[in-house]
């Protein structure tokens, strides 16, 4: 519902003028979010450009999406839509959804390892509750295991977890193995606790493949070598609260 409202709000602003990059990001967001009712005419009307311009944009997007094995389908009389595996769609969302769909303004980041601009982007594109629950889970991991993620890893986790919750709540779940059978990441004990916490916060159920998604994220994340930094981050958070 929040996503529909955000797009509806953007539709009302007919004076908005976008660059090609912004237009493509908007179209990518609509397609990757699972909308299948958008025609070239509708994109043309909303973005105040010709159908020829939209067609050229979609051709450019086709080349980008092919890097993730995502196909753009154009059926006469129907909307433009994509097909591809769920894991690839999430990776593409992280790469290409670079402009805010909503207009919520953030004055201060909730953690000093992420920028106001990034937090604003995630909240406007993937929902404030999804963002807040994702950050709460990361803080839970850090507090439970006495670690502190690096700035880059904290940002990566927040982004991907936010996208995961956004997709799962829309009914788009991973349905196949994304970790090869011969690869053992050995994070299963931590993952179980994280999934339990995430499920409790979000009221969502995560299947075995969604657990693999979290396992990959945790295995990719790096922690600060200085444990005193973790205490400083925790102290800073308490002062802000």
Spans of features found by a protein language model:
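A cross-family "folded-core" feature that marks the main globular domain of proteins
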Residues: 1-241
